[in-house]
Amino acid sequence: WVPVLRYSEVLLTKAEALANLGTGVDADAVALINAVRARSSAAPVAPLTKDALIAAVLKERRIELAFEGQGEFEFLRTGRNIPAHSVVAEQAYGSDYVVLPIPKSEMDMNMKLIQNHGY
């Protein structure tokens, strides 16, 4: 397994950071979102508030990074609940069972490890 970081993900991560740092709409963040959208000939976005800008970044990440296995990490990173799926109930942010347990073999080899809460 080799982790791959696409350029669009880098741009969207920077846009999200800029959006979260400011108190209003950051022009650089909007430009980064629109750079990603321009690659696929999508219409540019022009959010009017900080919340709308953050929502636009998260939506674009969902579209751009679909099916790449990053959904759960997105929810954990942004502090949002993980939505329910066909056979799995919604998991609240901070729930004991959102993060998997550390394998016992790893715990046995490193006595300084602390098991994740709930296991």
Which residue ranges define each predicted feature?
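Acidic/polar-rich alpha-helix caps and helix-coil junctions
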Residues: W1-Y119
